[in-house]
Regions:
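Extracellular/periplasmic helix-exit of transmembrane alpha-helices
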Residues: 239-249, 308-349
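Positively charged, low-complexity/disordered segments
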Residues: 361-377
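Membrane-interface loop-to-helix entry segments
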Residues: 205, 210-244, 307-310
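Extracellular loop-to-transmembrane helix junctions
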Residues: 98-149, 153-161, 174-201, 312-320
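Hydrophobic, membrane-embedded alpha-helices of multi-pass small-molecule transporters
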Residues: 80-92, 257-301, 305-306
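Membrane-water interface regions at transmembrane-helix termini and the short interhelical loops
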Residues: 132-137, 185, 202-224, 294-298
């Protein structure tokens, strides 16, 4: 017999099945909610669109057929903000992390920020070169996990995978915290509300990513490129003013820093190493491109390698530029506000980028930077 209509009460017998009473029938199409329909043989077709299905369609969009997966592959201009946003956004706090550590020894040690930044930049250069080889040797997208598993065994692969999971969680936490801190430096009304704002931003970013890699890439491309433009504009604008003979000083340049202790000899060496490791936050997210090689347009490996080269050159330039500008303008920061001698009562300590922007008279651009940081991946 033929498959019954929606009002019928039974389905046809399938002779290919071992028992003649076992039935199959493909339900009729009821439009875009077809995948959410249900029916029962012997009872009739039930038309129930579940709440979860409707919510999934609204939030995540329509699922793509397998033959349309090629439409989600990313060109370099979109892949850069998608996979490199972690590393690029680290510029917003890597310099500050170095200075906060060195500030424990007082103002005199802040001059070591440039050496720490140079060491971090060199490590980033080496890491980028290494990952450029990885994307050619392991183009399947396994990244560090695949490299460790193939060469060292499954146990080492699991260790690497666990480390990556922890790294991803910390990256989100630190990046969002930095974004909210930059916003709070510009808008006093946000002080005391950092945690709720950060949680709301994480939820928003999660929803954008669940829409799919191409959709999220389009959403992230504009703010990430605008963030890079804002940072480069700030650095170039300050460089032009310095070249013309202007003296740029941060508002915190007249404040003294009370050292937490006296560091010399071995203690100073360990403090310098700690500053270097803190600055290595600038390396966060470099591995994301090697994990996402399958998402690139063909030739996948070559495009991934080019994106890595762009990431390395842009991130190193911005990171070193922000660090040099912080030293030239004599930005003073400390872990504890009480350590800043001369800071006005009730004044909230600003981030390094906020201080630099204020010095170079680019306040409106910093506001843009802070908003962009909240929208990155």
């Amino acid at each position: 017999t033929e498959c019954p209509s929606a009002s019928s009460s039974w389905a046809r017998v399938d002779p290919t099945r071992p028992h003649p009473m076992m039935t199959t029938c493909t339900p009729p199409s009821y439009g875009p909610l077809r995948s959410g329909l249900g029916y029962r043989a012997g009872v009739g077709f039930g038309f129930v669109a579940t709440v979860s299905h409707v919510a999934k369609r609204i939030l995540f969009g329509r699922a793509l057929a397998s033959d349309r997966l090629g439409e989600t592959l990313l060109p370099i201009r979109v892949a850069l903000p998608v996979f490199a946003s972690d590393a690029l956004s680290s510029v917003a706090y890597a310099t500050e992390e170095i200075m906060l550590v060195l500030a424990l020894g007082g103002i005199a040690l802040l001059s070591g920020s440039l050496w720490a930044a140079a060491a971090v930049a060199f490590v980033m250069f080496v890491v980028v070169l290494s990952y450029r080889q990885n994307v050619h040797a392991y183009p399947s997208g396994g990244g560090d996990y695949e490299v460790a598993t193939v060469n060292l065994g499954q146990n080492f692969g699991l260790i690497v995978a666990s480390a990556l999971l922890v790294d991803y969680v910390l990256t989100v936490a630190v990046s969002i915290s930095s974004a909210v801190a930059n916003l709070a430096s510009s808008f006093d009304m946000l002080h005391g509300h950092n945690v709720p704002v950060a949680i709301a931003c994480i939820l928003g970013i999660t929803m954008m990513n669940l829409r799919g890699v191409k959709e999220s890439g389009t959403l992230f491309a504009i703010p990430v490129y605008a963030f890079m433009l804002a940072i480069f504009t700030m650095i170039i604008h300050a460089a032009i003013r310095l070249a013309s003979g202007d003296v740029l000083r941060a508002e915190s340049s007249t404040w003294d820093i009370t050292p937490a202790d006296s560091f010399s000899g071995l203690a100073l060496a360990f403090l310098s190493l700690r500053a270097f490791t803190s600055g290595c936050t600038a390396l966060t997210g470099v591995e994301a491109i090697s994990n996402g090689v399958p998402a690139f347009r063909p030739p996948k490996s070559r495009n991934a390698a080019r994106t890595l080269a762009l990431l390395g050159s842009i991130a190193i330039t911005m990171f070193v530029g922000v660090t040099v500008l912080a030293l030239v303008t004599q930005v003073h920061v400390a872990v504890d506000d009480a350590a800043l001698v001369g800071m006005p009562q009730g004044y909230h300590q600003k981030t390094v980028i906020r201080s630099e922007e204020h010095t170079s008279e680019l306040q409106s651009r910093l506001h843009l930077v802070c908003r962009l940081l909240l929208e990155k991946k």
